[in-house]
């Protein structure tokens, strides 16, 4: 599974720009989970992911980080990261779980 997490904050002008660039991307990638985390209201999650600046966009494939963008990311670059993540093979934890279940 591919996941994209955008870390923002309400007073961040660049975050508003990133949201505009991301408009419609969820429709283009219906199998990807998109989340937005406001670091002012969910500091614990930001700390868990090691995020200190906004906007920060993280891309995960099968629970493993495959891309990180600090600052505004162009739509083409984000789409390339999403497509690359979608081609990642399952991570070690997933493979081990599959083996254990046998």
Label each residue range with its predicted role.
Residues 49-58:
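Structural micro-motif
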Residues 1-29:
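Local sequence-structure signature of Cys/Sec-based thiol-disulfide redox active-site neighborhoods
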Residues 58-94:
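Non-catalytic, surface beta->alpha helical segment in thiol-disulfide oxidoreductase systems
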Residues 7, 30-44:
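Thiol-based oxidoreductase modules, predominantly thioredoxin-like and allied folds used
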Residues 13, 40, 66:
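Nucleotide phosphate-binding site architecture
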Residues 24, 48-49, 75:
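Chalcogenol-based redox active-site neighborhoods
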Residues 1-5, 27, 83-102:
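Haloarchaeal acidic low-complexity proteome signature biased toward cell-envelope/secretome components but also
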């Amino acid at each position: 599974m591919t996941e994209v997490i955008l870390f923002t904050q309400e007073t961040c002008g660049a975050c508003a720009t990133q949201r505009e660039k991301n408009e419609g991307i969820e429709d283009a990638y219906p199998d990807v989970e998109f989340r937005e985390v406001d670091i002012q209201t969910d500091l614990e999650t930001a700390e868990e992911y090691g995020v200190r600046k906004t906007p920060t966009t993280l891309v995960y494939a099968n629970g493993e980080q495959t891309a990180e963008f600090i600052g505004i990311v162009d739509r083409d670059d984000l789409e390339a990261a999403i497509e690359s993540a979608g081609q990642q093979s399952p991570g070690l934890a997933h493979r081990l779980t599959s083996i254990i279940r046998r």
